[in-house]
């Protein structure tokens, strides 16, 4: 009696995991057929045990929902702070603020704090919608999600304010933000796996903040990964947050 074969696929990305599983099964079938000297493919139902880890039903929504959450964070915590600053430039109220005795750091902080609060509220609502509408609940700790979300919100809001400091009109701000948002969506692993990209593109993703947050969300939601195991992602997001917020304060005029 032949030994049983166990095949386990990483099904976080349902499409990629399913295709990889089929390739492996077909390869095994052809190999067994050649070894037995048979013309028809061997029947693998009694020999092979197939297991899809992290996403047993191969539901593609489980892969996409975290990406949609991040896109929502970028639109709310990225677009709105930039438009707020540029809107005050166009209306002239920014000049009145500049003559007040507050420091640039306090002004930047006053612009960021409301969007930090809104962002954390959006995280809560997004998780509730994912649970109630799509039946997707995090396997890991919710604290890991909130910690990553806070760092990402700090990063994207500081990034948007930096862009606003170099923009003169709302139209200019929207065009620049749209360019970066499309780059984030296409190159950060939100919609397509980073592993399937060319080598140069994979290296380029290392400087894109959403890459690290989408790994946090998918790992916590589907794998149950802990905060300690995601420390490199948190460190990267914290570094981006520090750099962009310092740039936002230094470039403000």
Model-found features: residue ranges?
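Hydrophobic alpha-helical segments typical of transmembrane helices
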Residues: 3, 23, 81, 92-93, ...
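Residue-level hotspots within pore-lining transmembrane alpha-helices
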Residues: 28, 70-74, 82, 86, ...
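Hydrophobic alpha-helical interface/terminus motif in multipass membrane transporters
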Residues: 24, 81, 85, 94-97, ...
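Transport-system extracytoplasmic interface segments
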Residues: 1-80
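Membrane-spanning alpha-helical segments of multipass transporters and channels
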Residues: 137-253
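Hydrophobic alpha-helical transmembrane segments of multi-pass membrane transport proteins
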Residues: 51-132
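Transmembrane alpha-helix boundary/anchor motif
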Residues: 19, 76, 80, 89, ...
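Hydrophobic alpha-helical transmembrane segments
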Residues: 5-23, 86-98, 119-127, 176-192
């Amino acid at each position: 009696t032949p030994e049983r074969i166990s095949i386990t696929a990483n099904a976080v990305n349902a499409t990629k995991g399913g295709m990889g599983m089929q390739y492996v099964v077909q390869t095994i079938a052809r190999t067994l057929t050649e070894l037995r000297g048979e013309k028809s493919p061997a029947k693998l139902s009694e020999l092979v045990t197939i297991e899809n880890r992290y996403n047993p039903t191969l539901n593609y929504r489980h892969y996409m929902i975290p990406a949609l959450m991040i896109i929502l964070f970028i639109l709310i915590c990225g677009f709105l702070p930039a438009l707020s600053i540029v809107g005050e430039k166009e209306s002239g109220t920014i000049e009145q603020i500049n003559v007040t005795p507050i420091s640039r750091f306090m002004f930047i902080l006053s612009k960021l704090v409301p969007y930090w609060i809104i962002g954390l509220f959006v995280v809560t609502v997004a998780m509730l919608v994912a649970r109630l509408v799509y039946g997707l609940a995090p396997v890991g700790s919710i604290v890991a999600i909130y910690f990553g979300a806070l760092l990402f919100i700090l990063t994207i809001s500081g990034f948007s304010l930096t862009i606003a400091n170099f923009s003169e009109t709302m139209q200019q701000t929207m065009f620049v933000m749209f360019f970066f948002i499309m780059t984030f969506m296409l190159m950060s692993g939100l919609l397509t796996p980073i592993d399937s990209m060319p080598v140069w593109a994979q290296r380029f993703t290392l400087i894109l903040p959403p890459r690290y947050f989408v790994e946090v969300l998918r790992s916590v939601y589907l794998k149950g990964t802990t905060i300690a195991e995601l420390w490199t992602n948190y460190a990267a997001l914290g570094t981006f947050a520090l750099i962009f917020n310092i740039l936002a304060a230094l470039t403000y005029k």
